[in-house]
Amino acid sequence: LTDIDGSIINLKELASKKRVVIITIKTAECPVCQSQLIRIKKKLNVLVACNVTFLVFSPGSVDKIKKAKSITQFPFPFIMDTNLAISKSLNLTIDEFQILPAILLLNENLEIEWEQRGRNSLFYGDPELMKILQCSSWI
């Protein structure tokens, strides 16, 4: 995988060292998706203690995704899902331009250990993620 800054991510190596959580966002401009990243960012101190890292998959142009990264200040790699190829392989597409918002927890074999599909302004799924990660101090 290559992120929007051109850095190469060895997913297998990453998953062997950390718990990898993939967050898919509907579009780079999605305000609810951006809110979720900001919510999770507020708990990074707890998540770091739980050995968790994140990857954010988004449709859209690099410029739009970079803007979303700037708005959220989410300090993890953002990956442009070109032609929604990754999302299609995970059955996470809404249409040809949008990804179904989801949270995926991968195991060390890159298999989905847990998933939460869907998101709205009343339901983000991050408390459920914290519970499955067994990270304490979640409000």
Predicted feature residues:
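N-terminal "domain-start" segment that seeds a small globular fold
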Residues: 1-13, 35, 131
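Short acidic-hydrophobic, aromatic-tinged amphipathic segments that line or gate anion-handling sites
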Residues: 2, 77-81
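Short active-site neighborhood of thiol/selenol oxidoreductases, capturing the structured segment around
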Residues: 11-40
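Structural microenvironment flanking redox-active thiols in thiol-disulfide oxidoreductases
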Residues: 35-72, 86-87
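Structural micro-motif
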Residues: 73-76, 94-104
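Thiol-/selenol-based redox modules, centered on thioredoxin-like
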Residues: 100-139
